Amino acid sequence: MYNGEVPTSFYAACAQLKCSRTLSLKTVRRTVFTFASSLTLEARHGRLQVLSSLNFRINKKEIYRSISLSLSKKLSESWAFCFRCGIIDLVIEMLEKNVQNRNQVEIICIEDLVPQSHLLRKIESAVDFKKIYDFVEDLYCTDNGRPSIDPVILFKMVLIQHLYGIRSLRRVADEVSLNIAYRWFLGYAINEPTPHFSTLSYNFRHRFIEGTVDKIFNWILDEIANEGYLNPEAVFIDGTHIKANANKNKKIKEQVPVAAKRYAEELLEEINADREAHGKKPFDDEQKPPKSKNQQKKNNTSKKKLKRRKKEEKMKEVTKSTTDPESGLFVKGEHKRQFAYEAHTACEKNGYVVGVEVTPGNVHDSVAFDDVYDEVVEKYPEVETIVADSAYKTPHICKKVFDDGRVLSTSYKRPMTKKGNHPWYEYVYDEFYDAVICPANQMLRYSTTNRDGYREYKSDPHICMNCPTRHLCTASKDCVKIVTKHIWHDYVELAEDIRHTPEYAELYKERKEKIERVFADAKEKHAMRYTPYRGLTAVKNWVKLKFAAMNLKKYAIHKDFDRKRREYYDIFSSAFLCLATLIMKQVKPEIQFS
């Protein structure tokens, strides 16, 4: 049995510690190992408690962690087991105790309390925030009213919120009053009162409207572009959902008009031209009723019926939230349903967000593409390639991008055909006969061009009725197979051909590293997974300010890194020049460097 005596080797190690003025974890680990290695396995049956008086300041958790590493690495498993189970209990007590003197008066400089490597220092040196005065000057009255809080301070407070992922403005106001680095960034002394959260909230709800936020967002992008950090040759576009501040159980069903497509007029013109080329009557967009009574009786269509039909065609039923009516019901799979907004975002190769458009969560990515694309192309005409996933592989988007002289790089899009039927590629289009050849080598002739822009090719029902593979082709009662082809399908085939080229295939692989990383950082580091705001305008301003903060953060880090790299380059180049001068003087004294 263990007699409870402490080995002399341990006292010698402790004495060595007392003579030293520094106490590192390596020294503690070596001391504990000296003590533990002198014990025997008989300590399993007893409980050893050692008190050591060390006049040093050190965290107990670090000591225990060090002891655990020592026992697990340098001793046998049995000793580690004894320590973990509490058979050996090592307690280190400190003689020196800190007396809490909270009323001590000191003279300090807030500049000295903020580390030189702090992110806010990098941001402060990266841009000149005085530019904000030009954006908000017309929003303030200069000759009457109470003195206002500096608008730069208000924008900096919101910038702090998005940089550090603080969810509410109330929490931002509390953090600013407590955090010394935040006070330094805003220009407040330690004992100076900071703005109330209600002031911050009121200004960003009623004064700094959407136009002001857009100016801030574009100003930061201009600063980044002027320094040469933007590379908009390839732009990556995608959308991400943001959970709305709305209860998914509080909802109503409502009939809303179907939103007209932006390219509806252009599409209708080409549809009518295609119908006329095939000898069909063009569509009349106004759908005027027949004028004569004989025509009304012949068509069995009255004026009231046409109005009712027109009304029914342009209305649809949607699920609306009673809490936030401007949000949309986002459906993903069979079970995931929630009210959300969607941020359709575009970024360039370095990860800077160059454009964003916020829509309700039930708006498809391809519908919001035009707004994002037009915004990016207007600011950066040098864009050459648009990289997007298969959701953007639609005839209109392909036509729009290729007609502008740019390239659309997309992925494979799964055909939306019935499982078990003939695959789509077995229906071959014959351009000479303007017909489709089915797997049974029968021709499907042109029938019409519908209002959605699709040419319809129909089979002969007498042939299909006796076809042995009809069950793999169609289940229609009249035995007619219909194959549709969009009038802009050639642009989709061009995008499919580009997908197989090595250059654009490698470029598409970067999509997950660029735009997906932007979304991951925004949600994990900057609290964009859930919005506390309600209403499309408020959420859009919130998203744009968040992306502006992310751009500014990335820009400040890049600029600080380049500054340090230039400093190191100057040091090494000077040292190399001096060394080369000394060497050349020894080899050829007559050669000197100026």
Descriptions of predicted regions:
Residues L17-C19, L75, Q586-P589:
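Cationic, low-complexity basic patches in intrinsically disordered or flexible, solvent-exposed regions
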Residues E96-K97, G165-L178, Y188-S594:
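Anion-binding and metal-coordination hotspots
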Residues C14, C19, C82-C85, C578:
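Cysteine-centered motifs
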Residues Y2, T34, R47, S70, ...:
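Short, positively charged and aromatic/hydrophobic N-terminal segments
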Residues Q116-L159, Y164-G165:
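Basic, short loop/linker segments at the boundary and entry of helix-turn-helix/winged-helix-like folds
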Residues Y11, S20, L39, L54-R57, ...:
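Short hydrophobic targeting helices and cationic amphipathic motifs
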Residues G4, A12-A15, A36, G46:
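Short hydrophobic alpha-helical segments enriched in small aliphatic residues
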